[in-house]
């Protein structure tokens, strides 16, 4: 069962509350995937809120109340689904092409693949369509009203195929992928309409038949941060954070983060790892389709790596933003230089910067720099997913 919500992301605590409720309904943990569309114009959720965007916020209780309500709403949705009358369907799969994404980190990888899984009734007509694309849902820019961005318009187009068609979107490896144009609802609607039309035109004819059961796995991987816990290094880290906090040009959230991390260095109250959920579904029939759902804002290089070793998108569906989003998940290629996705600022490469400041971490992820060095984030991710796909 895959549940998708139009929110930026689920934090660890909220995800675990929802997962616990679903398990209590009789669903095996490995059979449940919770995904966020990652719209940047969705409702505020707790956990990553304080102290970075809540300087003058007085209704934090309302934020928590909404999160509690959302958790129950999603659990009720699962319960309703489980109690509903079953329908006989067949599954078929195909991959189509879209072209409005760009690699914002300047790498060569650009997401074009759109995996599409269709459930058809006994009459051959589509009943449900699951589809994905790897581009940040930021085409609409910053809006003051709720806006699900391009996935919503794509869903509208697909569901216009005919009565009774349900469409669902899951976000691909979009950590370093943005729409090539952003800034208005009109832009977002245009991209969504184009994506939806592409999928709608494709589902008129069945793709490759998917058979068999599903072998599901749910695991957690521990990813190392690049932190040397010695008195001398922590003193240097504290000094670097103090300089950032005092610099007149430091943006508000980065200044607040620096203040907090300076205190953490003094108190030695910081994590040295990030815990990330991973899921793999493997269809056990002859079709050979496998689906990967990673937590975090996974960058496209991981998808490129695993597709190349598993028969491309025709055999491997790779998605991110599943279950929990504790950070961007960069590759060694990104960690070798500064950048937002890497969580490294050029003026202070030894401390957390960019996205790692936003996500409230003490340092950026560890990069393996030699064959004898400890495994870094990329090696840990590759080993875990490879094992699960085997």
Task: Pin down the residues of each PLM region.
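Non-catalytic substrate/cofactor recognition surfaces at enzyme active-site rims
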Residues: 1-390
């Amino acid at each position: 069962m895959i549940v998708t919500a139009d929110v930026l992301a689920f934090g660890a605590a909220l995800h675990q509350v929802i997962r616990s409720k679903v398990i209590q309904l009789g669903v095996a943990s490995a059979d449940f995937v919770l995904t966020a569309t990652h719209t940047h114009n969705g409702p505020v959720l707790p956990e990553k809120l304080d102290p970075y965007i809540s300087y003058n916020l007085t209704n934090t209780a309302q934020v928590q109340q909404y999160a509690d309500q959302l958790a129950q709403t999603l659990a009720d949705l699962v319960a309703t689904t489980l109690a509903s009358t079953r329908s006989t369907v067949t599954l078929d799969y195909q991959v189509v092409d879209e072209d409005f994404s760009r690699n914002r980190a300047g790498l060569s990888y650009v997401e074009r693949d759109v995996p599409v899984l269709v459930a058809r009734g006994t009459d051959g007509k589509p009943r449900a369509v699951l589809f994905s694309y790897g581009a940040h849902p930021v085409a609409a820019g910053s809006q003051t009203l709720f806006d699900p961005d391009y996935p919503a318009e794509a869903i509208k187009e697909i569901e216009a195929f005919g009565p009774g068609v349900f469409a669902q979107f899951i976000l691909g490896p979009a950590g370093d992928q943005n729409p090539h144009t952003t800034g208005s609802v009109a832009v977002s609607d245009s991209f969504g309409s184009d994506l939806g039309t592409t999928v709608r035109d494709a589902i008129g004819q069945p793709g490759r038949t998917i058979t068999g059961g599903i072998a599901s796995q749910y695991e957690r991987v521990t990813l190392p941060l690049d932190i040397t816990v010695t008195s001398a290094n922590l003193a240097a880290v504290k000094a670097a954070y103090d300089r950032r906090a005092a610099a007149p040009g430091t943006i508000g959230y980065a200044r607040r983060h620096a203040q907090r991390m300076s205190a953490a260095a003094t108190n030695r109250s910081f994590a040295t790892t990030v815990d990330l959920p991973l899921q793999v579904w493997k269809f056990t029939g002859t079709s050979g389709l496998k689906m990967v759902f990673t937590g975090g804002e996974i960058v496209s290089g991981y998808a490129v790596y695993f597709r190349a070793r598993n028969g491309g998108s025709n055999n491997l569906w790779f998605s991110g933003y599943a279950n929990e989003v504790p950070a961007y998940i960069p590759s060694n290629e990104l960690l070798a230089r500064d950048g937002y996705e890497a969580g490294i600022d050029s003026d202070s490469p030894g401390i957390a910067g960019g996205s790692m400041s936003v996500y409230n971490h003490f340092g950026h992820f560890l990069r393996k720099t030699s064959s004898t060095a400890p495994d870094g984030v990329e090696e840990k991710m590759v080993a875990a997913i490879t094992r699960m796909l085997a």
